[in-house]
Amino acid sequence: MKQTIILLYGGRSAEREVSVLSAESVMRAVNYDRFTVKTFFISQSGDSIKTQEFSHAPGQEDRLMTNETIDWDKKVAPSAIYEEGAVVFPVLHGPMGEDGSVQGFLEVLKMPYVGCNILSSSLAMDKITTKRVLESAGIAQVPYVAIVEGDDVTAKIAEVEEKLAYPVFTKPSNMGSSVGISKSENQEELRQALKLAFRYDSRVLVEQGVNAREIEVGLLGNYDVKSTLPGEVVKDVAFYDYDAKYIDNKVTMDIPAKISDDVVAVMRQNAETAFRAIGGLGLSRCDFFYTDKGEIFLNELNTMPGFTQWSMYPLLWENMGISYPELIERLVDLAKESFDKREAHLI
């Protein structure tokens, strides 16, 4: 009998369009000899919509429901996703997706799910908190200043100019896929960048800009996490923003990255250390800066990296000999393993 994968996609965050792309890639890559796929769309307003079911590979003409094609007659209660024995694959990016909220809901439903748990998801989603945890783990990061809504912005800008040097990058603390990120070359640009970032979150991070290559490492596993050889994001734009990643395709990927064995070893070790420091489970992608001075800075941990056909994470594992369909199978098995352990602890 086939096992059911319940694919959750869409969501309320600014990254909902990325989620649809990831979900369509996953539904086409699943091993349908082993799995049946049932899909549920979470609308921009937060409603749950029961969408397609697939017992065999979908055709090229098959497309998942989006906010533009919603069939409101198929609206269901969020708990309608429950199916005994099914594993949930929450292909949700950003807030209300990979920040622990959906993970908590799935734990209340007593359902296994792919990826990190409540704590590690919420921790990694918040850039400021992640930085503080990684500092305690002894992992190098670029200098930064944290700004919280209600702070004296003028005083904080003065702190930025005292501790950092232009250019700086301003980021919402609780967002991903480069949404709301700006590069600032002077104080006026910084003020505008802060206004943009505060549209997406009440906590904002200002980081020192560095002249660096962007190198990424894939992580797979629970308590025995394994890492990939690094890959490099090769950019044709000023910085790797949302449009460059998902709309304009102005990036290419060099897998494996052309870096020395010593640098590879440090990045893989730091990635695995960071994953353990946050209590990661299932998967993550760890992003590094490798500066022209030879410095290695950990930039962020992404607990639900993109799964589009051009995304770095599946390509990194493909380079390690694990195909896209096999990667999905391993993630499902890891989800069941972590679920069994979580349930065993409830005694």
UniProtKB/Swiss-Prot annotation:
GO MF terms held by the record: ATP binding; D-alanine-D-alanine ligase activity; metal ion binding
UniProt binding sites for ATP: 161-216
Cofactor(s) this protein requires: Mg(2+); Mn(2+)
GO CC terms of this entry: cytosol
Pathways per UniProt: Cell wall biogenesis; peptidoglycan biosynthesis
GO biological process, one term: peptidoglycan biosynthetic process
PROSITE patterns cross-referenced by the UniProt entry: ATP_GRASP (PS50975), DALA_DALA_LIGASE_1 (PS00843), DALA_DALA_LIGASE_2 (PS00844)
Binding note for cofactor: Binds 2 magnesium or manganese ions per subunit.
Catalytic activity from the UniProt record: 2 D-alanine + ATP = D-alanyl-D-alanine + ADP + phosphate + H(+)
Binding locations of Mg(2+) 1: 287, 300
Subcellular location per the Swiss-Prot or TrEMBL entry: Cytoplasm
InterPro entries (alphabetical): ATP-grasp, ATP_grasp_subdomain_1, D-Ala_lig_Van_CS, D_ala_D_ala, Dala_Dala_lig_C, Dala_Dala_lig_N, PreATP-grasp_dom_sf
Domain ATP-grasp: 131-333
Superkingdom as given in the UniProt entry: Bacteria
Presence of keyword Cell wall biogenesis/degradation: yes
Magnesium listed as a keyword: yes
Role, per record: Cell wall formation.
HAMAP family reported for this sequence: Dala_Dala_lig (MF_00047)
Family: Belongs to the D-alanine--D-alanine ligase family.
Family annotation (NCBIfam families): D_ala_D_alaTIGR, PRK01966.1-4, PRK01966.1-5
Protein name as catalogued: D-alanine--D-alanine ligase
The encoding gene: ddl
